[in-house]
């Protein structure tokens, strides 16, 4: 927990996985120099100004993410963090007043750090129930304010980012990770439609392009298998309900 509330004064927000950087991953700070990569646009404090600019430019939709750890700081609390819920409600209300439709990512590589340390990276079935609790909370909280949802951002990168020489065990772990996320995603779709039949809930696939090394048929077929496992597999499961690929290795 940020005992000093973080330099950005984010109340009640525990660390998430993306914030756990190894030593040396951040640049040293030097007095008098400006580092925009450290604070980016600081949307937390400037969302009203940012949304006003989006309205001025004529934008009709704005995609953003809800941070799981801002709603359930460790992922296992019985009650959500009200300050986190209020922040997103204020953002969505501001968007509605500006005539901008929010498109919300429910999970964007931001598993609460406490869950990661306790259960590993989506390698325990307990994640499914915890994710269900999280999505139930936000679907209820923002009913009428948010209609368009994405369950998992770039879910297929679990496979895409494996090295070419990954072992069968690494593939087995990656597919187990995906399986739990597929189940959690399906449950989120069910829950979301039960809470609000007007909800539109989809998936987000990272569009990575693969090219064959040569025109040799074996290279063409290998390239096709990369497309199937890296792109189509995750899309087919979530869009068609088809689980077609069973081989754990490339």
Where are these regions (language model features)?
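Aromatic-lined substrate-binding rim segments of carbohydrate-active enzymes
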Residues: 51-57, 62-108, 192
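Active-site region of glycoside hydrolase catalytic domains
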Residues: 1-21, 31, 75, 92-247
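Glycine-rich anion/phosphate-binding loops
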Residues: 38-48, 79-87, 124-133
């Amino acid at each position: 927990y940020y005992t000093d509330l973080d330099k950005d004064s984010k109340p009640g927000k525990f660390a998430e996985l993306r914030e756990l950087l190894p030593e040396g991953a951040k640049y040293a700070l030097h007095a008098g120099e400006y580092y925009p990569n450290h604070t980016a646009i600081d949307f937390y404090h400037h969302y009203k100004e940012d949304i006003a600019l989006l309205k001025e430019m004529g934008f009709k939709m704005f995609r953003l993410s809800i941070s799981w750890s801002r709603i359930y700081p460790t992922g296992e609390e019985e009650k959500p963090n009200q300050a986190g819920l209020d922040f997103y409600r204020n953002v969505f209300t501001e968007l509605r007043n500006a005539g901008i439709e929010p498109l919300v990512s429910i999970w964007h590589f931001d598993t609460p750090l406490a869950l990661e340390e306790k259960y590993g990276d989506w390698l325990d079935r307990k994640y499914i129930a915890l994710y269900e609790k999280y999505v139930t909370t936000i679907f209820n909280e923002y009913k009428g304010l948010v209609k368009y949802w994405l369950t998992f951002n770039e879910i297929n990168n679990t496979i895409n980012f494996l090295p070419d020489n990954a072992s069968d065990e690494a593939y087995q772990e990656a597919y187990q990770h995906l399986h739990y996320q597929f189940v959690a995603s399906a449950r989120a779709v069910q829950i979301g439609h039960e809470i609000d039949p007007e909800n539109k809930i989809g998936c987000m696939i990272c569009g990575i392009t693969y090219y064959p090394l040569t025109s040799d048929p074996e290279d063409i077929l290998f390239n096709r298998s990369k497309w199937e496992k890296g792109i189509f597999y995750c899309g087919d499961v979530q869009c068609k309900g088809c689980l077609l690929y069973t081989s754990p290795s490339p």
